[in-house]
Structures are given as structure tokens and as C-alpha cells.
Design a protein with these regions (language model features):
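A short hydrophobic beta-strand->loop->alpha-helix junction that borders the nucleotide-binding pocket
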Residues: 30-31, 52-60, 114-115, 135
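Short loop/turn elements that form and flank the Walker-type P-loop nucleotide-binding site
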Residues: 8, 20-24, 46-48, 76-81, ...
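Short glycine-rich substrate-engagement loop in P-loop NTPases that contacts/grips substrate
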Residues: 6-12, 49-82, 93
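Conserved catalytic/switch belt of AAA+ P-loop NTPases
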Residues: 16-19, 85, 89-128
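Short conserved motifs of the RecA-like P-loop NTPase core
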Residues: 157-168
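Conserved AAA+ ATPase "SRH/arginine-finger" region at the nucleotide-binding site
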Residues: 55-57, 131-144
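A short, basic N-terminal segment
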Residues: 2-20
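Walker A/P-loop
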Residues: 16-54, 69-72, 100-101, 105
Length: 168
């Protein structure tokens, strides 16, 4: 994972969480392209949990019920479920409240992603049960690493003629 050292280094909040294997519900707040979705997937994989994903733009309570059914089945087999909700700020108060009993019971660990300030967009009852982590925009060097990895994975080689800097 590239960037976000202020969260991921061994002595930083998410780094400690992964080292201690003590996952908690959280909000990942940052600009588009800062790695919110990728980080959620990595956290889930590191913790050995089942990953479910929802988009608050496209889905609602009906889909949440389906996810909760899956989570109950996994829980019966002693496997935890991480529910990643992209654009969580798009859910209304009632939809956000629907997460509360399931976070409190431990059925799901919620990781919400938002580009908006959670203090204004996430209702206080839900926000009080989540830790908020601020992701920073990737800098030029970090974007270069990401771009080079993507190009290498596709066996594309750019000559050192400034083409990469135009991509970034």
C-alpha cells in the first residue's frame, strides 16, 4: 500500500490495530483516489474477515438486510464480517441508524468511506461508535509508485521522456 504512513506505520493507529488483531469500526475520510477502498480491503484481508461491500449511492436497507444475513452465517462459523460502505455520508439518518445494533452486537465491523466531513454528514449516534481516520491526498512520489506498479503489471514500459509525469 502506498501512502498514509501517518495511519499505517507500526506505531500509528491502523498499524497498531493490525498488529494487535483488534479490529474496530471506523470511518476513512479522504479525497478521491486516496486509497479508502483499497485500505478497507487490506484491513479485512489482514484480519481474516469476510468482506462485504455496499454503495450508499446505489443501495439501501434491503441490501443491508442481505449483508446481515450473510454476516450471521459467517458468525455461526466463527468468522467475522467487515462491511465496507462507500459514500456512507449519502445514507440518511434512518439508514445510518440501521447499523447501530449490528455494530454493538459485534455482528459486523463497519468501515465507512467518505469524502465529506463526518462531523457534519454522519449522525452523532453512529459517529460515536466509530473512529475517524483522515487519509491524505497522495503526493507526486506516491502517485509515481502507483503508476509504475500499474504499468509494470500490464508490461508497459515508458521511456524516461517525461511521459509518466504527464500521466500523473
Amino acid at each position: 500500500f502506498v501512502g498514509q504512513r501517518h495511519l499505517l506505520d507500526a506505531d500509528k493507529p491502523i498499524g497498531k490495530t493490525l498488529a494487535d488483531s483488534k479490529l474496530h469500526s471506523m470511518i476513512l475520510w479522504g479525497p478521491p483516489g486516496s486509497g479508502k477502498t483499497t485500505l478497507a480491503r487490506i484491513i479485512c484481508r489482514q484480519m481474516g474477515a469476510h468482506f462485504e461491500q455496499m454503495s450508499a449511492v446505489l443501495e439501501g436497507i434491503k441490501e443491508l438486510r442481505n449483508v446481515l444475513d450473510h454476516a450471521q452465517r459467517y458468525q455461526q462459523h466463527n468468522k467475522s464480517t467487515v462491511l465496507f460502505v462507500d459514500e456512507i455520508h449519502r445514507f440518511n439518518k434512518a439508514q445510518q441508524d440501521a447499523f447501530l445494533p449490528h455494530i454493538e452486537s459485534g455482528l459486523i465491523t463497519l468501515i465507512g468511506a467518505t469524502t465529506e466531513n463526518p462531523s457534519f454528514e454522519i449522525n452523532s449516534s453512529l459517529l460515536s461508535r466509530l473512529r475517524v481516520y483522515v487519509l491524505k491526498k497522495l503526493n507526486y512520489d506516491e502517485l509515481s509508485i502507483v503508476a509504475n506498479r500499474a504499468l509494470e503489471s500490464q508490461s508497459v514500459n515508458l521511456e524516461d521522456d517525461g511521459s509518466l509525469s504527464q500521466i500523473i
